[in-house]
């Protein structure tokens, strides 16, 4: 019979692989769409499109954390086989989202003109921006329901279906965006295309949810006002840390749009897109860990929960640090292959933001396991600290230094907020801060030989790489990756950082993992 450890491990690895496939596909489509948007819209309209998404992301957070709260509660209901509570949660939240959506449309539609006028937009672009931002309110309502059924499937640990829906709708997203831009419909056409894509995604998620939960029903008899308190109580506390994340990733775009020429929003966003690759890939793992941690916590299985935390932290650092070092080394190649030119402002954003984003990744298992077991009050305080620092530092530094001030302010806030979170977690759960830092240092040293080898290669490449040649830059980038990866794997084996426990946990899933174990002396 399959043991509990095997079931958790199998689901965790399966969901990680599905998340990896879905996110890599989505990253690829975003990288494809960005040069397309830039070529048709230009820098200023592209910046307006960035602000459209930034404002939409902020408004999504007005749900007071229902999204992540639902994942936790659905995971617990599923573990208990409680279909009645699932129906009550889905129906109650549907009613809440309808009420919230209608309220936001009525309240914000008239003031979008005032909001758009606050940004450094040219007069001929202002009215177009107003219509674009108003379209974002309609997209927002659809997104609320997408997030609801996405949470239902994630709570049942069916990341295969959520990612299938994501990949499926990405095709009409790319084709639709290209078509409306070719027709000359500009930002208005993109808003219509995005709304249609999210409606299609919602339809797919509902169909998948009915298959996973055949007992799923909606009806007035399932509305439970008493459930709202539990959902909001957990979600509101967790939401503070998520708002802090949103501020660190998006507030600078708003501040830049307010205080400096609008083109700097474009430069910042392009740098953030490259840096977000570092942030996004490890979060593939977190999305799979969160419901698994909730399930283990509901069973009081603390031994496997802490094994998940300790080993997960090591695997996370082994994955994220080479991506960070690789991003530092190859930022110029990435930009030349992607956009056809290297902008000093965009490259500077990549260096600062990738470092800041990595600080969040380095404590990612702290935040994810903590949220899974209900440890959210401290995350709320860390989020508040990070938010205040980010807004204060970025605003002051932008006024004093311009564009670079936003980069320095965000990096400072991320370093301080995540350091506080790690210290409090280790204190509350009797974990070792020194052990965490030693592991970070050890993995960094493992990366030193491949990083130095790659640096020598890049210095050699710089002597012959033609400026503006995308193909040559891509070839040089692939060559650097081809040099770094085998050198890194050899360094892992030589260092002995992986042990027999790792082989027992992952040996059935990762081909030839045993070859990375150091041979006994």
Functional labels for PLM-detected ranges:
Residues 1-12, 187, 205-249, 288, ...:
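Interhelical loop/hinge segments that connect adjacent transmembrane helices in multipass membrane
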Residues 1-31, 84-92, 126-130, 205, ...:
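N-terminal membrane topogenesis motif
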Residues 1-6, 431-433, 455-521:
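Membrane-proximal transmembrane or re-entrant/amphipathic helices at the cytosolic face
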Residues 8-76, 102-109, 139, 169, ...:
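Signature of the first transmembrane helix
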Residues 12, 141-166, 188, 354-386:
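Membrane-interface junctions at transmembrane-helix termini in multi-pass inner-membrane proteins
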Residues 14-31, 169, 193-201, 205, ...:
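Transmembrane helical elements of multi-pass membrane transporters/channels
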Residues 64-80, 94, 155, 213-217, ...:
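Helix-loop junctions and terminal segments of transmembrane helices
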Residues 134, 163-212, 234, 275, ...:
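Hydrophobic alpha-helical transmembrane segments
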